[in-house]
């Protein structure tokens, strides 16, 4: 366990090394967060258990970068990994009233029994209308052994401040699909094949503190066949809580 946590720490330091050259003059934000479950695209990355995360975001001219380290607590989905570090480098520009953004994303796992790392590319278009901020996007992972093929995630999301309150409502609807080269490993990101996920959340922000509650779910069949990378017990509708402090 100590060796696994040490590797996770080294990955985190590597992530910081990518972004810290700009910290002194271009720091955007850093935060720590605790959540009842680390859920991505409706799938638990911690087998339904509490997780902790820390991240930093910086910019240098038109380029920005971030590093986020999250505990995964021996997740079967990621072959027993204790933590993951997400490294993102991207840029954005305005096309009229629409904000276009592109990102290159790497996911590095610490403590897994095998090589679980994989990469993705993302593009999105966002538009603000009054208090509503809406986004359409796609995230694609080319075919890789770690995920048993390719993976494409299409989504629509929106958030809006509730007038007269410190509350923000959030929503997202997404769909995952892709090719399969290894049916066992493909279960990591697409259990049972292509599926749809949803999220409806509410946030309260006060200074540096953010409190959030989310209702999330998927249409994944919980009774389907399981394998070493499947965690079908944590794909159903559920309510999550999270607390974040920004610096």
Q: Predicted regions span which residues?
A:
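Residues that define the transmembrane beta-barrel architecture of outer-membrane proteins
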Residues: 26, 48-52, 81-85, 98, ...
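Outer-membrane beta-barrel "beta-signal"
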Residues: 200, 204-207, 215, 233-247
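Transmembrane beta-strands of outer-membrane beta-barrel proteins
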Residues: 28-32, 54, 63-67, 87, ...
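Cleavable N-terminal export/targeting peptides
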Residues: 1-27, 247
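Outer-membrane beta-barrel translocator domains and adjoining extracellular loop/strand segments
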Residues: 42-47, 76-83, 112-119, 145-151, ...
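Glycine- and aromatic-enriched membrane insertion/assembly motifs of diderm outer-membrane
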Residues: 47-102
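Detector for outer-membrane/organellar transmembrane beta-barrel domains
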Residues: 118-190
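Transmembrane beta-strands of outer-membrane beta-barrel pores
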Residues: 34-40, 60-62, 69-75, 106-110, ...
